[in-house]
Amino acid sequence: MRKILLTAAFAALTLASSVSANWITGEPTILAVNSGEAAFHTALTSDQRLDVNLTAGAEGKADLTFTTKASESALSLTALPVLVNEEAGYADAKLTITPLVNDANGLRFYLVDTGEAGGAHIVSYKGGTFKSAFNAADLENINGASSFTVEKKQILFHTKENGTDATYTLSLDTKSLTFTAVK
């Protein structure tokens, strides 16, 4: 009887710990351009690099390339729409890249926040390879402004168009390293 109780207690602890993964964010990299075009090169880690071409004008666009020193593989995201804010005759475009780690399995991701729903992405990194893990443009009828919120236990994707707000909960499939959005 005691053995059964100990086994049940151990199983309960094991199941509880596998469900209690936390999302941990790193310091975001914020890139901005004012009425024009700019190229940025930044280190994500000592081995990972991000190259960005960001344009602000009548519309904003961004091209991103994730690379590593050790691998020839690269992930390119091209012509991502970026929200342009116009104030005092200036067109400003801003792009935010936020590192994200799942503490249960150590998987690393990068949130790409362009402010425009069609440009929002999550990029995964595992074993020297970058992969697109979430593309908001794949969601049905997604337009307008957008943002991510990272909470301890979940990632939320918010959209706002014509005064209508929508929130999606993003669930990670650890086998495919992709996120599924549920409204």
Predicted regions and their residues:
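Entry beta-strands of beta-propeller and related beta-repeat scaffolds
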Residues: 49, 104-110, 152-156
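Short beta-strands within extracellular/lumenal beta-sheet-rich domains
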Residues: 90-97, 142
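N-terminal signal peptide c-region/cleavage motif recognized by signal peptidases
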Residues: 16-18
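Hydrophobic beta-strand positions in blades of beta-propellers and related beta-sheet-rich domains
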Residues: 63-72, 120-122, 165-169
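Positively charged n-region of N-terminal signal peptides that target proteins for export
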Residues: 1-4
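Terminal domain-start segments
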Residues: 10, 20-92
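Long, charged/polar, surface-exposed segments that mediate recognition or autoinhibition
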Residues: 96-135
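Acidic, small-residue rich beta-repeat scaffolds with periodic aromatic anchors
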Residues: 21-46, 54-59, 125-183
